[in-house]
């Protein structure tokens, strides 16, 4: 059974490109454009992994990660934060909020696929 990745990004174009690339690699994809939608889908759909943009219009990525971690139904799901912000303080904030990793955009498909496989293969 294919693994499911929840792609969370408010930029529709980036979300569609990333989703299409991951689909072509054999993943099932769910998408969310806001933090609220991401939390709801994480809890209801229980994807195998979440790719989470840090800057969302309603709830910032670290707060989304905290909400996902605080719900028993979704606390186990690996979360990879993605952002154009590259300072160490952003990475630190993401990891302290419960994200499992933090990648700086632009991110190559190979790096994303490697990270997804790393987390999915070492399921909690």
Specify the residue positions occupied by each region the protein language model found.
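Two-component/phosphorelay signaling modules centered on CheY-like receiver
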Residues: 12-30
